[in-house]
Amino acid sequence: PTGSGKPSLLNVLSGRVPAGGILSGEVTVNGQARSEDFNERVAYVMQEELLFAFLTVHETFMLHARLRLPPSTPDKEKAESVDRLIAELGLKNVRDSPVGSPGGFRRGLSGGERKRCNIGVEMVHDPAAIFLDEPTSGLDSFQAQNVMSALRDLAGNGRSVVCTIHQPRSSIFAMFDQLMLLTDGRLAFIGDASAAVGYFETLMFKCPTLTNPADFFMDVMSMDFRSESREGNSRSRVDFFAREAASRGLGEAAASKALESVALAKRQGAFDGEKEETTSAKSPGGAGWATQFYLLSQRAHKCQRRDVVGVGVTVFLDVVYALLLSALYRGVGDDQEGVQNRLGCLFFICLNLAYSSALPSINLFAAEKNIVIREQASGAYATSAYYLSKLVAELPKLSSKFVFCTLVYWIVGFNPDPTRYLNFLLIVICEC
């Protein structure tokens, strides 16, 4: 249920405890402590789809493949890997379509396609396990079914898929192999998903016939705060589930069963610890700094070039403001009043350049902040490479400032000496 601690548990399991968070106990993988490169071996997909609207699905995947796969991997092999992943996620029909943005501001993928694209971004380095925070959130039942079917296929290809989910439909619930039920931050059940209904029957809570088990679990495990009596009853019920799970040792039994499965796989030769240690993470370290800078610069230039409306509006406003400013100060004299007017004109030039240069950049960094945080948490690139790539990508925008300053300079009638004009432009460029 809502507020049961699902995202917190997922963050702990995936090794992404927020800064300042306090963790007691330990997390083990196959009975052993997590290795230093654990985060490189797993993928974490956030609930929010954090993607660049102007890139296509293929471009998005290829960028992350080039950033996160080893430099020794040929581009042809990376492209083939990306195409296989696109096919696995059912995105072949939108391979070359722009991702777009939610709400239809920039048209692109549907909600379910965006979810699958968001998953694919974290799958390009072929992780051994993938953690997902409510991958069906905000989707209709059909799109949710498609997303979970894609995840089921990924699990069938030898990957471990761990996801939190809120009130799935019955057909989605039937896809689960293992199930953990949390209530009020405590364990209520863990084990085979097919055994959950029977377990609750032993507690005298029987799932009605023709009822979705997930809906039944939500009903009996949720806290009801509509009145004190209902809160007390639901609190007693939740405490009962937590006590029973603890007294029956469900957590210990599930852990023991998992370790037995690993031991059996080792005996049968299906699991080679040494081999897994060297091959489960394909990326011992992705692209170098120079490659990161080049790829991020390419991405920034593509997004800027394809934002036709944004670029057009910027140029249009610069030209309009230049003409208005020129109309106000055109033909000023060389007397004391004219000098003061020229100083006023220069002040407005500086003011326009300062605001028109700074505000778009501030808005851009704010818009991309969450994407960058997600990508850096995955180890995609260095902060310095991203920052410098954005600076380089902003250079073409100086052309509109060049037009603005040129129009104002010559229409108003500043010093016609070419050297003075070039000095003026140099100062303007430095200010931008």
Predicted segments — roles?
Residues 123-128:
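A short, proline-enriched helix->beta-strand linker immediately N-terminal to the Walker B motif
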Residues 157, 163-164, 169-173, 178-181, ...:
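Alpha-helical transmembrane segments and their short interhelical loops
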Residues 130-134:
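Catalytic Walker B motif of ABC-type/P-loop ATPase nucleotide-binding domains
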Residues 4, 36-37, 48-59, 72-73:
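Conserved catalytic motifs of ABC-family nucleotide-binding domains
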Residues 1-2, 24-26, 31, 46, ...:
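Topological signature of polytopic alpha-helical transporters
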Residues 119-120, 147:
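Hydrophobic anchor residue at the start of the ABC signature
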Residues 11-17:
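Helix-to-loop junction immediately C-terminal to a conserved catalytic motif
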Residues 141-142:
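Helix N-cap at the start of a conserved alpha-helix in ABC-type nucleotide-binding domains
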